[in-house]
Amino acid sequence: MDRVFINLHLVSMVDKQQTGSDGYQVLKDTMIGVRNGKVEYVGEPCPSILHGHPDIIDCAHALVTPGFIDCHTHLIFAGNRANEFEQRLLGIPYEEIAKQGGGILSTVHATREASEDELYHLAVQRLEGLKRDGVTTIEIKSGYGLTLDDEIKMLKVAKRISELPDMKVSTTLLAAHAVPPEYKNRSDEYIDLICESIIPQVVKLNLANHVDVFCEGIGFSPKQCERVFRAALNHGLRIKGHTEQLSNLEGSALAASMGADSVDHIEYLDENGVKALATNNTVATLLPGAFYYLKESKLPPIPLLRQYKIPMAIATDFNPGTSPIASLRTIMNMACTLFKLTPEESLRGVTCHAAQALGLQHFRGKIAVGMEADFAIWQLESPAELSYRLGVPDLIARVVDGEIFHEK
């Protein structure tokens, strides 16, 4: 054993059939043993695992959870859209701002102008808030380049971030985020570029784990999204989708039928769409930050998701326009207060279900033997406090592959 954590109160998030507990129950006076970055022992204090003089970390009865996973972010961009925030407060709809060249295309212009190094330094600064909230894995999308070179530039930045010792990264190609201005009224030709040039080159450079699309009236049609999904799958990439955020185009059912790991936003998802998620074991990712910033009133169908036992993930959707929130714990609180999730559902949403949304459920999101040793150590008494309390520095340390990182 390389390192042993003792005197901790564990919230493992491991399934009940595997442990006899529900994963949310606090297991007091627990010990975790780590070897080569993996969990090798979890359980009651066991003197025998202290043989060999491992590094012993006394957690002093702190609460330990899996490291948090922010499974949907747009972390890499230049500029900001505070002016659009003001416009929306004056009553101008998001769709109208987008049609006038604002929205995503505003950020596209700024991001195209920025160098790779500039984008990297901006993104690393934004990570700090997420680290303080216990995040050990982050998903990062492209989607503000919308050309071959600029999408690759963004994904190269994400790859550089993945080389940091204290943050794991899952990368997503989101070239189908918006129609770039040079392809106005020629969106099918832009889809050709994505399928025939961008996806093959991204695969050649090994820059992405997933391909995502924005299936919406101001984005791309289900038929266009299906083409992108098929090209991604043909090149060995996994898929996910921004679906049913502003209307119901049945994009969630399409994505699920093609094997998507998750569909995200889903405010307008109906029962047929929920059934498709259940049939295909697709995660529903809730993004209350965007719901809040856009002052939406249409709630995701939480009762239906519960009825059909759909795993619900939660993410920041961190982006400059509709969710500039670099705090996953704030999002957990919003999921409870706005979407009426329980604190347990909220915690599952940023651990085991977030891992599943990225296809990482066999490696992260739980504290169990064989899983990667990623967890967060909190000065808290109960897991409900993670959703309940905001703005208090409760995090003692993050552990990534067994290595300890104390936050400032």
Swiss-Prot record:
GO terms for molecular function: imidazolonepropionase activity; iron ion binding; zinc ion binding. Keywords: Cytoplasm, Histidine metabolism, Hydrolase, Iron, Metal-binding, Zinc. It catalyses: 4-imidazolone-5-propanoate + H2O = N-formimidoyl-L-glutamate. Zn(2+) binds at H72, H74, H242, D317. Its EC number is 3.5.2.7. Pathway: Amino-acid degradation; L-histidine degradation into L-glutamate; N-formimidoyl-L-glutamate from L-histidine: step 3/3. Binds 1 zinc or iron ion per subunit. GO terms for biological process: L-histidine catabolic process to glutamate and formamide; L-histidine catabolic process to glutamate and formate. N-formimidoyl-L-glutamate binds at Y144, N319, G321. Its cofactor is Zn(2+); Fe(3+). The keyword Zinc applies. HAMAP family: HutI. Belongs to the metallo-dependent hydrolases superfamily. HutI family. This is Imidazolonepropionase. The lineage of its organism: Bacteria, Pseudomonadati, Pseudomonadota, Gammaproteobacteria, Vibrionales.
